[in-house]
Amino acid sequence: KMGYKLDDLSYLHEAVPLDEVFKVTKQLCADTNSEEFKRMLRRFVREVVVPKGKLRTPVAVQRFMNVRIMLPTTPDLFFPFHTGLLYGHGIASRSLWMPFTDVTADEDRTRSMQIMDIHKSRELAQYAIDRELSLDEMTELFRPHMKQIKAGPGSLCLFSQQHIHGSGEPNTTGKTRVSMDWRIAEGIYGDLLGRKIPGGYMHLVPETEEEEEAIAARPSRDGLYNNGKQNMFYVANN
């Protein structure tokens, strides 16, 4: 669709010029908000994520997925070890990570995502907060306890906002990693989502295919709110 000749995403850096990678990433993220993609995602949530994750419906997912392209040619750009809580995600949501490139080999460690077990994550995150550690200090503290996620296309890692995760180091494999991550939350915990509120950052997933069809049959919002009058904007509410 974008005009690049590419058979293996692991070699994306050879097909896409460096100064165009951001444009590709931005377009892929935007495409995840298309109706076709959202419907496919919601079906995946109902059929796979909810039962596998033992989640209670209704659930909400974020509106735009995060598509990540981790190049081997930009050693200064990588994802530091962190928790979702540090990035403003509430305790009630969970993260999902899906690799689109195979990172199962030991030598893929620096281009895969790494994660720490939940008990150690809670312990070391609190230790870092109490001592107000810098990013470099946290990286050195967390690194010995990180485990490589060995997975490939079709795999999914579901984890909490308390898990410490990230790449933590430059990609030195000579191959690109492409992945997608997003968040899901059970509706009953809507007040525990931090600043990622339903209706804004997240939207509810219809619980059945019938409900999905009914929503799809509704008139578009553009037509619904078009009354021929000018829009009104409130610049201040006192």
What annotation goes with each model-predicted range?
Residues 50-57, 103-112, 173-175, 210:
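Intrinsically disordered, low-complexity coil segments
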Residues 76-151, 193:
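Catalytic core of non-heme Fe(II) oxygenases with the double-stranded beta-helix
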Residues 67, 72-74, 86, 101-105, ...:
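Short, solvent-exposed loop/turn segments at secondary-structure junctions
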